[in-house]
Amino acid sequence: DKQFHREYLAKDITNYGGGNNRGPQLWEGKAISWHSQMQFAGRITKTRVPDHGWYRITIHDLDAINPGSDGYLWGTLQTGSGYSNEPLLYPLGIVEATQQSKTKILEGWMQKDHMLVFKPNEANLKNLPSKGGSFSFEGRNFEKMGFAGFRFEKITIERIYPVGDRKKVRSHLFADFDLEELKA
């Protein structure tokens, strides 16, 4: 099996090009994924994985911007194609953040060519304004405007093998069974 290990710095996963921008904002060297109820908000297009499999996702130096009155901000980490031609998103986990930075590690199954979708996801939060299905960050300070967001330094994605690589799994399943006997 191929090894896969990638580190995505904030500057690598934020997008300000034209088109349908729904990804994180780059602000003071960190990525910020803001709350929005728009479909696929929080998608991180560069995090597509090359194969179906189990992955460990590490969100480094994560903290909450404008958390709720209890000091917490809750959200979701999901995977999917990130586009309307394949609209389903698959849960990887629930994420909790406070104003104190921490590293979060989640593990889950990802399909080939799927990306991460990461955003705050509480119903009572202010919804980030969007125009034409896209976010415009230019000239706006969403933190000062009271919007909630997840701020982080980078994301690491690595392929893992919880019960072993392909050879080890085959050994566990079939032990000493000779597959050639079936052909006879």
What are these regions (language model features)?
Residues 1-184:
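Low-complexity, glycine/serine/threonine/alanine-rich intrinsically disordered linker
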